[in-house]
């Protein structure tokens, strides 16, 4: 859910009940034209837009006594180099924003740390997608606030769903190889 509290609760339940071997969280960043492998989550919620619960958080720590940041433990660099090498639209990003995506990324690591679990975990921002197989230069119905990791614009780039799905599947494959 696009909710600070809801995402923390859902993550806590899933990580406790399922006990996965790896965690790969995804979020849409409208306006990006590449799949972004996020490298760092910071202990900060700060966006002047509401989440789905109507909550606005500005300059608030996610966990007041928590770490300042967590780094992805997914094989980000190796996946990026390999996928970029075959011409896929990927990038390494050093900011997951300060909205719910960053919150999810941070909370996943914090919860895993509290559970004493050291497993691969990270976050990937995907651009808006369209169902056909040709990239679109613009979609005028999509906008996103900069705090959410996107851009505010009347037209934003999109990628074909199949391309995004392939990139995410490849990152999962690379993660499973290093486990």
Language model segments and positions:
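An accessory alpha-helical subdomain
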Residues: 121-136, 145-146
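Short intrinsically disordered coil segments
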Residues: 139-141
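N-terminal catalytic or cofactor-binding beta/alpha core of small enzyme domains
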Residues: 1-98, 109-118, 143, 147-179
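Small/polar glycine-rich anion-binding or flexible loop at a beta-alpha turn
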Residues: 97-101, 126-128
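Active-site glycine-rich loop that binds ribose-phosphate moieties when present
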Residues: 101, 105-107
């Amino acid at each position: 859910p696009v909710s600070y509290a809801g995402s923390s609760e859902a993550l806590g339940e899933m990580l406790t009940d399922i006990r996965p071997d790896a965690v790969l969280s995804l979020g849409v960043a409208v306006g990006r034209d590449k799949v972004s492998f996020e490298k760092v989550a910071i202990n900060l919620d700060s966006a002047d837009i509401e989440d789905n619960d109507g909550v606005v958080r500005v300059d608030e720590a996610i966990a007041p006594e928590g770490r300042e940041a967590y780094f992805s433990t997914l094989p980000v660099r190796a996946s990026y180099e390999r996928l970029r090498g075959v011409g896929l639209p990927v990038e390494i990003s050093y900011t997951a924003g300060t909205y719910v995506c960053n919150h999810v990324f941070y909370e996943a690591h914090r919860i895993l740390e509290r559970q004493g679990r050291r497993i691969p975990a990270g976050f990937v921002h995907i651009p808006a997608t369209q169902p056909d197989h040709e990239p679109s230069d613009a979609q005028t119905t999509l906008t996103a606030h900069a705090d959410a990791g996107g851009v505010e614009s009347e037209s934003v780039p999109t990628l074909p769903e199949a391309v995004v799905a392939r990139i995410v599947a490849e990152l999962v494959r690379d993660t499973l190889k290093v486990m």
